[in-house]
């Protein structure tokens, strides 16, 4: 059943998107390997090697989704971002992600606002070395925010989440699903005694002042009742006030759907980061005296 739902989700995303033509330019030492694949053997140096994506079709004040597949050896931290001029100053917004050993899908979102001459790019932070490959790069204008914007929230073919910080690096895993009503995989969060566990969306997700964010997901505990929480986190660099919306809930031994809604404030003078049009989704297990584990599945994020 989940496989059918996955296909339906991708079909809905395709129907709600407007393809945008892009020109891809790999800068050395990135190499074009053919068939839309680009590779690099990154040495960890302070060179920020990049792939540039340009388009004459990117419009202001629109949301765009960059989809691609990636794989990597090592622990290199790759960035994907959008840069351009805004109000006479250079403005750059980026997302950091890390690929695994096998090709997996990624979906990243950007809000162009009033950005002039925008350029999308990949580059790599100095640090861990590794071999990295990306392929099937595609840029779409997101025409309908009412569809699910987390196509890999079912964890069957990819994972739209990563540990919230290095502290939680070992608390997240994708495992065989424990009797979920569809599909074969679920996300597992595992916490030690007197500790918590938390993941966040890899992508910044669209958030429109005056509109309502709807988050849906299923959860079950491995044993007993575990306190869980979710944040809609609007905190962005360069802004003084940090808006976030917390939700608390209990995770029981049986699968239960959790549905949460939040009307995004329109006061962009107080909460200036809302002008960026983006937020992150965070899901976690609360810090308690007991160790525990919980499973998450069917995560959806949309705007109405």
Protein language model features and the residues they cover:
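Positively charged n-region of N-terminal signal peptides that target proteins for export
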Residues: 1-5
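Short helix-onset patch at the extreme N-terminus, typifying the N->h transition
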Residues: 6-9, 24-26
């Amino acid at each position: 059943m989940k496989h059918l739902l996955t296909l339906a989700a991708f079909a809905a995303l395709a129907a709600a998107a407007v393809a945008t033509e892009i020109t891809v330019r790999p800068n050395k030492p990135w190499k074009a390997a053919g068939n839309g694949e680009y590779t690099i053997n990154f040495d960890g140096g302070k060179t920020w090697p990049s792939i540039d994506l340009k388009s004459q079709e990117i419009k202001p004040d629109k949301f765009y989704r960059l989809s691609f597949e990636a794989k990597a050896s090592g622990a290199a931290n790759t960035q994907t971002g959008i840069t351009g001029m805004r109000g006479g100053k250079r403005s750059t917004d980026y997302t950091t992600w890390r690929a695994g050993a096998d090709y997996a899908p990624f979906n990243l979102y950007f809000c162009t606002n009033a950005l002039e001459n925008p350029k999308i790019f990949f580059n790599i932070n100095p640090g861990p070395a590794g071999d990295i490959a990306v392929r099937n790069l595609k840029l779409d204008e997101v025409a309908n925010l009412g569809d699910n914007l987390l196509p890999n929230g079912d964890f069957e073919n990819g994972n739209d989440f990563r540990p919230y910080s290095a502290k939680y690096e070992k608390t997240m895993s994708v495992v065989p699903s424990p009797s979920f009503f569809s599909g074969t995989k679920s996300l597992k969060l595992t916490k030690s005694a007197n500790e918590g566990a938390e993941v966040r969306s890899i992508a910044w997700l669209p958030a429109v002042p005056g509109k309502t964010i709807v988050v849906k997901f299923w959860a079950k505990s491995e044993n007993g009742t575990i306190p869980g929480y979710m944040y809609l986190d609007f905190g962005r660099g360069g802004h003084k006030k940090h808006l976030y919306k917390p939700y608390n809930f209990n995770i029981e031994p049986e699968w239960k759907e959790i549905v949460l809604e939040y009307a995004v404030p329109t006061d962009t003078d107080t909460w200036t980061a809302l002008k960026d049009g983006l937020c992150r989704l965070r899901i976690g297990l609360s810090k308690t005296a007991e160790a525990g584990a919980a499973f998450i599945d069917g995560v959806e994020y949309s705007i109405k």
